[in-house]
Amino acid sequence: MAPLDLDKYVEIARLCKYLPENDLKRLCDYVCDLLLEESNVQPVSTPVTVCGDIHGQFYDLCELFRTGGQVPDTNYIFMGDFVDRGYYSLETFTYLLALKAKWPDRITLLRGNHESRQITQVYGFYDECQTKYGNANAWRYCTKVFDMLTVAALIDEQILCVHGGLSPDIKTLDQIRTIERNQEIPHKGAFCDLVWSDPEDVDTWAISPRGAGWLFGAKVTNEFVHINNLKLICRAHQLVHEGYKFMFDEKLVTVWSAPNYCYRCGNIASIMVFKDVNTREPKLFRAVPDSERVIPPRTTTPYFL
């Protein structure tokens, strides 16, 4: 079989186009093989730029790259939730996969709670694949990649990046390293908590209103950071109107990278640039104006009209 034309895939994806089904399958298989080599806690070196949820907002992802620099000039960590809710989940995920395939050491993709079969069948990605390809094969190829995505990244051994937050079942990074990640996200337990939990002003742990994961407080965060010799926990998973938010004596930061979320929230987005572990700079960006994006029709037009 001919080798993958990764340059072509990147170029197609950059134009907000999706690949022919067979090319997408080959790209997904290729990225799965790359992800197989990655640890549950993937080491990453500074300088690096950390990004939060994207949710299928393709044109805003392009704005993110204009703000932070293109791959491979900038080294990126994306903390999950690439798909669902936005108009272009398929094109967004395809673009990130193509970049990962072409420059695997310059972009680290973490799993979010939306990188799941169950969630994508409810929040849009499954239906989008069905509409654009006429079948669910593309969705199946992508969900195989979901299962392979790593769950955390560790910047210079001192900054932990994870989609959601902490778990009462995890005290050390080594306990994250032993999780069996190649599966659908379970309904409860350590793996589930890492992608579903939220920081909150609670004593230790509290039931999460999301119905999965936990709410965790400053005491829990400080203990975890201390035991694991960390400076900071970076996470995404929650809309922040200002783009980012520090909590718990600046031991934790939420980074949100989907501006004007769902095309109506009016929020700013951010990415967090780490020159080194002690030098961080948030970069803010706004949604691309409607004149610069293509708004797809609500439903596909029947062929015979």
Curated annotation (Swiss-Prot):
Sites of N-acetylmethionine modification: 1
Keyword Zinc-finger among UniProt keywords: no
Catalytic residues (positions): 114 (proton donor)
UniProt keyword terms in alphabetical order: Acetylation, Cell cycle, Cytoplasm, Hydrolase, Immunity, Innate immunity, Manganese, Metal-binding, Mitochondrion, Protein phosphatase
Localization, UniProt: Mitochondrion; Cytoplasm
Name this polypeptide is given: Serine/threonine-protein phosphatase 6 catalytic subunit
Taxonomic superkingdom: Eukaryota
Gene3D superfamilies: 3.60.21.10
Induction entry: Regulated by IL2/interleukin-2 in peripheral blood T cells.
Cofactor(s) annotated in UniProt: Mn(2+)
Keyword Coiled coil: no
Reaction catalysed by this enzyme: O-phospho-L-seryl-[protein] + H2O = L-seryl-[protein] + phosphate; O-phospho-L-threonyl-[protein] + H2O = L-threonyl-[protein] + phosphate
Function in brief: Catalytic subunit of protein phosphatase 6 (PP6). PP6 is a component of a signaling pathway regulating cell cycle progression in response to IL2 receptor stimulation. N-terminal domain restricts G1 to S phase progression in cancer cells, in part through control of cyclin D1. During mitosis, regulates spindle positioning. Down-regulates MAP3K7 kinase activation of the IL1 signaling pathway by dephosphorylation of MAP3K7. Also participates in the innate immune defense against viruses by desphosphorylating RIGI, an essential step that triggers RIGI-mediated signaling activation.
Gene of this entry: PPP6C
Residues reported in the UniProt entry to bind Mn(2+) 2: 81, 113, 163, 237
Stated family: Belongs to the PPP phosphatase family. PP-6 (PP-V) subfamily.
Residues reported to bind Mn(2+) 1: 53, 55, 81
E.C. number(s) listed in UniProt: 3.1.3.16
Major localisation: mitochondrion
Effect annotated for changing residue 189 to R: Found in patients with melanomas; decreased protein phosphatase activity, leading to increased phosphorylation of STING1
Tissues expressing this chain: Ubiquitously expressed in all tissues tested with highest expression levels in testis, heart, kidney, brain, stomach, liver and skeletal muscle and lowest in placenta, lung colon and spleen.
Enzyme class: hydrolase
InterPro entries reported in the protein's UniProt record: Calcineurin-like_PHP_ApaH (IPR004843), Metallo-depent_PP-like (IPR029052), PPA2-like (IPR047129), Ser/Thr-sp_prot-phosphatase (IPR006186)
Single Gene Ontology BP annotation: innate immune response
